[in-house]
Amino acid sequence: MTKLIIHLVSDSSVQTVKHAANSALAQFTSIKQKLYHWPMIRNLELLNEVLSKIESKHGIVLYTIADQELRKALTKFCYELKIPCISVIGKIIKEMSVFSGIEIEKEQNYNYKFDKTYFDTLNAIDYAIRHDDGQMINELSESDIILIGPSRTSKTPTSVFLAYNGLKAANIPYVYNCPFPDFIEKNIDQLVVGLVINPNRLIEIREARLNLLQINENKSYTDFNIVQRECIEVRKICNQRNWPVIDVSTRSIEETAALIMRIYYNRKNKYHK
């Protein structure tokens, strides 16, 4: 099997480059992949260390570096090695500059901008943590989104992912034979989304969870009929109230969150900024 080596170089956390690389790699499932992460490369000394690693492990280089001197050094080095060197956002920045008529700033300020978006994100993360798994249900009116679904349908990580995008998300588990809280219907301003999953897949996930915790007594947790009933009931609850339902069986957390955000902003007639 072919192996593809990719070096992710950034003057920040490499998340932007990583997302771009993963999106592209999703189109090449038949090859082995090896990603090398090189974050916080902000001077020539650090860059030279990375260049030596690239020289020993030839592969595609993806980068986001604002400093012009560092960019030139990196691209020149890769050119001499005859390996691809791709700026992930360079084309975007250039087109923005051309379209707006605004010159690209030559100096990069590495001080993080603590603006409203930053603090909104912190507040949303705090909210997601405090309102995880049905906690503090008396504060649901403060949420933007409420997720409901059986246990292990990725409600918690989805809530956190939404929080990183500035949305306050609470999540409430649905448990078989337990009455669903009536108060949730009073929160008419919130988007309520049901998460369901293929019962067989959910049983696999729950069994893995029980094995990890070394628990062998909770048989109802992995009983097919009960698991299937939980998913059916969540669909029923949502359909009766015109709440959207998302099947997460084959979706990543990022995909689920992205779909929820699309529903949220369409519902609120907003655009994500």
Curated annotation (Swiss-Prot):
It is an enzyme of class 2 (transferase). InterPro entries: Kinase-pyrophosphorylase (IPR005177), P-loop_NTPase (IPR027417), PPDK_reg (IPR026565). Gene3D superfamilies: P-loop containing nucleotide triphosphate hydrolases. Its EC number is 2.7.11.32, 2.7.4.27. The keyword Nucleotide-binding applies. The keyword Repressor does not apply. One of its GO terms (molecular function) is phosphotransferase activity, phosphate group as acceptor. It comes from the Bacteria. Keywords: Kinase, Nucleotide-binding, Serine/threonine-protein kinase, Transferase. It catalyses: N(tele)-phospho-L-histidyl/L-threonyl-[pyruvate, phosphate dikinase] + ADP = N(tele)-phospho-L-histidyl/O-phospho-L-threonyl-[pyruvate, phosphate dikinase] + AMP + H(+); N(tele)-phospho-L-histidyl/O-phospho-L-threonyl-[pyruvate, phosphate dikinase] + phosphate + H(+) = N(tele)-phospho-L-histidyl/L-threonyl-[pyruvate, phosphate dikinase] + diphosphate. ADP binds at G149, P150, S151, R152, T153, S154, K155, T156. NCBIfam families: PRK05339.1. PANTHER family: PYRUVATE, PHOSPHATE DIKINASE REGULATORY PROTEIN 1, CHLOROPLASTIC (PTHR31756:SF3). Bifunctional serine/threonine kinase and phosphorylase involved in the regulation of the pyruvate, phosphate dikinase (PPDK) by catalyzing its phosphorylation/dephosphorylation. Belongs to the pyruvate, phosphate/water dikinase regulatory protein family. PDRP subfamily. This is Putative pyruvate, phosphate dikinase regulatory protein.
